[in-house]
Amino acid sequence: MTAQPQVLKIRRPDDWHIHLRDDDMLKTVVPYTSEFYGRAIVMPNLVPPVTTVAAAIAYRQRIMDAVPAGHDFTPLMTCYLTDSLDPAELERGFNEGVFTAAKLYPANATTNSSHGVTSTDAIMPVLERMEKLGMPLLVHGEVTHAEIDIFDREARFIDTVMEPLRQRLPGLKVVFEHITTKDAAEYVRDGNELLAATITPQHLMFNRNHMLVGGIRPHLYCLPVLKRNIHQQALRELVASGFSRAFLGTDSAPHARHRKEASCGCAGCFNAPTALGSYATVFEEMNALQHFEAFCSLNGPRFYGLPVNESYVELVREETTVVDSIALPNDSLVPFLAGETVRWTMKR
């Protein structure tokens, strides 16, 4: 039997999908990402959303102000697409190196998405400009029609929105974010080099039973919602295969405890403190640690056309108990896997 590795040394990873929020929350959560990641694609769903170059520059500065001394971290900013967005503003931001990508939220699909896009037809001039520029489109892939069951919204999105869009704009670079279904895993796997996907730790580790059986676990509630185990297994098999167009995107989405543990709780898992160890655990369970570094550190830069990070990080096999909560000025944050014992720990 092969001896278990005790240390995993990988190139410094990047997080290709994260929510850093703003104000006190921003100051609290940024260090958990900047300590170990070289770059992160920062979601623009603030209130109001980041829709201009000036807003993105200002937000980027607030993020950098929250990065502790000694951390080597670069936030990559995104533009929030709206029906009224000017293509020229998007192009200027991309050409000036302010916007790395643009984010399509179907209106009301998730937290702070009420300004989102009503239909791809409404933003076709913007999408055509992005295709011409080679600018990546990041997609929250769910339809939002009230009559569509929440567990079916991703699969329906592929058929009714994603595939027609990619047929219409075949040169458009698309990241299908936080995929959660067998349908999406197969769709991305069978796609061409212009289609990639991010996958979160929670969708690899858990399915809807973990969230709903024996009591409801609000800190596993995120959007897209956890699906049944056959979908979880399809995601695990995709990453374990070494598929090169799937990469790390935590979708870490912090909410204060009172907003999660509520009669109408918010969607999102704050997984930044525990994500890398969680991914390592999944890859080890799937006997696929040989593909772990590529998923975390190589596949994303290749798709985005960016250099890989030069430095390295290490995870050590050391059982650690995740803290129950993290202090906020007037509340607390509950991290993903709070109170649980984890197998892999980041070496500081």
From Swiss-Prot:
Any one Gene Ontology molecular-function term assigned to this protein's record: zinc ion binding
Residues annotated as binding substrate: H19, L20, R21, N45, H140, L223, H255, A267
Pfam families attached to this UniProt entry: Amidohydro_1 (PF01979)
GO biological process: 'de novo' pyrimidine nucleobase biosynthetic process; 'de novo' UMP biosynthetic process
Residues at which Zn(2+) 2 binds: K103, H140, H178
Cofactor(s) recorded in Swiss-Prot or TrEMBL: Zn(2+)
Catalytic activity of the protein: (S)-dihydroorotate + H2O = N-carbamoyl-L-aspartate + H(+)
Entry superkingdom: Bacteria
Function: Catalyzes the reversible cyclization of carbamoyl aspartate to dihydroorotate.
Protein name as annotated: Dihydroorotase
